[in-house]
Amino acid sequence: MSEELLINVNSFETRVALIVSGALQEIHMARSSGYSATGNIYLGKVVRIVPGMQAVFVDIGLDRPGFLHAADIQSSLMIAADDLGDVAPTKTKPNIRSLLHDGQTILVQVVKDPLGKKGPRLTTRIAIAAKFLVLTPYKNHVGISQRIENDDERIRLYRWLRPLVEKTQTGVIARTISDGADERVLLEDFELLQRIWSTIQYDTKNIKAPNIVYTELPIQNRLIRDLVGKTTQRIAVDDQTTFLRIREYMQTYAPEFLPRLYSYQDDVPIFERYAVEGEIARALEPTVSLPSGGSLVIEQTEALVSIDVNTNGFVSGADLEETVFKTNLEAAMSIPRQLRLRNLGGIIVIDFIDMLESKHRQEVLAALKLGLEKDPCKTFCDDFSQLGLVLMSRKRTRKSLEQTVCVPCDKCTGTGSIVSAESTCMEILREIFARHALNEEKCAGTRVCIVTAHDAVIGRFLDEDAKFLAQVSATLNCVIKFKPNPAIVSGYFDIRFSDDSAL
């Protein structure tokens, strides 16, 4: 299995694609107009206690207060299992008022970004990640990634890390990539995390709440930290400034992977070269075709994600049971990739086609669970229910691909979605860049680019995205003009170049 990390950067957004064995596995986006707080640590202030929910709301300085449930409060009275450790929850459940009070300052970390009308989800179980280790400062505990299966290696890591934990009275978790890692790099990681924690403790004592005390890494550095490993063959970056910043980061924190860092300078945009743009477009469609003619229909709602498996009339020979089994098996192997690609999380209900034979159901379930084992996000998968459904969950920390790129459709009362005006603006700017690069000689004397688009898209260009428009125009030495067309749906547009400045 080979992996490549493709990093596409411009003035208005950063996109990172993970390619596994030639197929797009994950897509991450960070826009200049957006902000993700996941991973950030804040000194917050309790502003409201809700006993009925066993929760509090905490002001951390964002637009909306964060939500902190009692189960996410680190306490000597109640230590529940979290996503990183393996400590079982106790039966003691003290009242929320015995843990916190109004106006109390508290150190919290964002585990889920705001979504819809909900504020950020918070925890007091601080976890700070480095390349090989995760520091859990409030837990005197050594954890080893479950993906490290070799018993001798687990024992080696535990015996080496335990004295450090006892000395500092802080917990630590060995990440999957620490499998076989030299003790020197593990010590460097541990010392880095201790310095970060010391800085957080100092700032906490010297600032007033609400305030931020730790900021998660920029998207490109964070993904290099979290995704680059032994199977990574290449890290390609198409922006020189970003390339130099990443190289500087890797020289300090991941020097062993520096030979795999590559500056992409081809005229063909990097996402076009690797066919990523088409994969992103297909990932926004509800229907996914399966190899034998069946399909998945994926629908995302506020409450859950539903996945329906269909044969689409495909029949292999005369054995209907075998046809259904084959379609379900293909679906089970496809679903884990679709969850990662679309970044779907929360409760997921899968409606497989009914199978008569128990062994077929078990094989389908085994294939699904095997695919989920490769997912870096925490997942849980139950058995088939009496209704033939499979209920599973996937940890959700950030918006899904659809929530990032699309908005609810105003023509169907929110039951569907269309590409947002913001996403359309980003696509138009990328397209102008790409067409200019592919026709550089022809466009060298071009003075005007005419864009025909929906009124909402043009309105955004003249307001929120005006600075990005000006940057592109200056970079390409090209005047960009607009022709509104209300009949064009957001997500569609037309671009043409002209040397007639009177247009």
Spell out what each predicted region is.
Residues 2-5, 26-37, 90-98, 115-122, ...:
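Active-site phosphate-binding and catalytic loops of NTP-dependent enzymes
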Residues 52-56, 60, 64-66, 110-136, ...:
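Conserved glycine-centered short motifs in functionally critical loops
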Residues 102-106, 208-209, 260, 343-346:
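Loop/turn-to-beta-strand initiation segments
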Residues 18, 29, 68-87, 122-130, ...:
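P-loop NTP-binding catalytic core
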Residues 31, 239, 351:
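Residues that line or immediately flank small-molecule/substrate-binding pockets and catalytic motifs
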Residues 29, 33-53, 89-114, 154-160, ...:
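Phosphate-interacting basic helix/loop segments used at nucleotide- and nucleic-acid interfaces
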Residues 1-123:
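Charged, low-complexity terminal tails
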Residues 142-277, 284, 377, 398-503:
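Charged, low-complexity intrinsically disordered tails
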